[in-house]
Swiss-Prot record:
It is found in: Cell inner membrane. This is Universal stress protein B. The chain crosses the membrane at residues 1-21, 90-110. GO terms for cellular component: plasma membrane. InterPro entries: Universal_stress_protein_B (IPR019598). Keywords: Cell inner membrane, Cell membrane, Membrane, Transmembrane, Transmembrane helix. It comes from Escherichia fergusonii (strain ATCC 35469 / DSM 13698 / CCUG 18766 / IAM 14443 / JCM 21226 / LMG 7866 / NBRC 102419 / NCTC 12128 / CDC 0568-73). It comes from the Bacteria. The keyword Zinc does not apply. Belongs to the universal stress protein B family. It is a multi-pass membrane protein.
Length: 111
């Protein structure tokens, strides 16, 4: 029989790997954005996005830009493809993090 604790830690590892993939895709999206739309790059604070002095309100702008699918009207196909990928990975990572939290609560109740 598989241990529930081992299953929980396996789920945590999968979640962490997907978070790393999401951040990597987001970083690649910002590189493409810098080349194809410098104004939007500045609008979302692309240069300081992953720094400690980054501006969270500008970072949230990019999240809402992708969440609302406003990128669909963009002229660059590569940028549209990257936004779609980041959006799918964000949804997957959010679902996995939710599952980890629910699993943790279940483990605390049952053990």
């Amino acid at each position: 029989m598989i241990s529930t604790v081992a299953l929980f830690w396996g789920l945590c590892v999968v979640c962490i790997i997907n978070m790393a993939r999401y951040f990597s895709s987001l970083r690649a999206l910002l590189v493409v954005l810098r080349g194809c739309d410098p104004l939007l790059y500045q609008y979302v604070d692309g240069g300081g996005f992953f720094t400690s002095h980054g501006q969270p309100n500008k970072q949230v702008r990019l999240v809402w830009y992708i969440y609302a699918q406003r990128y669909r009207d963009h002229h660059d196909e590569e940028f549209i493809r990257r936004c779609e990928r980041v959006r799918r990975q964000f949804i997957l990572t959010s679902a996995l993090c939710g599952l980890v939290v629910i699993s943790l609560i279940a483990l605390l109740i049952w053990h």
